[in-house]
Amino acid sequence: MARYFRRRKFCRFTAEGVAEIDYKDIATLKNYITESGKIVPSRITGTSAKYQRQLARAIKRARYLSLLPYTDLHQ
């Protein structure tokens, strides 16, 4: 039987040495929200607690300024 190895999750922001996550960096923020607009939890992405808080704050600011949608299309 073949054994499947799960890739080890790591925090991209820690690896790159990011000081602060910017709410204007929409390309990065879009990687951390689902198609429906929800914030992806850190247990899925592997983001550390410090950067998960910054990420949530940045996404909420971007939503408030209409840079990101709150939800997907309302149909």
UniProtKB/Swiss-Prot annotation:
SUPFAM superfamilies per record: Ribosomal protein S18
What are the BP-aspect GO terms? translation
The GO molecular function terms of this record are: small ribosomal subunit rRNA binding; structural constituent of ribosome
The record's listing under InterPro entries reads: Ribosomal_bS18 (IPR001648), Ribosomal_bS18_CS (IPR018275), Ribosomal_bS18_sf (IPR036870)
Quote any Pfam family the record assigns. Ribosomal_S18
Which UniProt keywords are listed? Ribonucleoprotein, Ribosomal protein, RNA-binding, rRNA-binding
A GO CC annotation recorded here is: cytosolic small ribosomal subunit
Function (record text): Binds as a heterodimer with protein bS6 to the central domain of the 16S rRNA, where it helps stabilize the platform of the 30S subunit.
Q: Which NCBIfam families match?
A: S18
State the family named in the UniProt similarity comment for this chain.
Belongs to the bacterial ribosomal protein bS18 family.
* Oligomer status and interactors: Part of the 30S ribosomal subunit. Forms a tight heterodimer with protein bS6.
Q: What is this protein called?
A: Small ribosomal subunit protein bS18
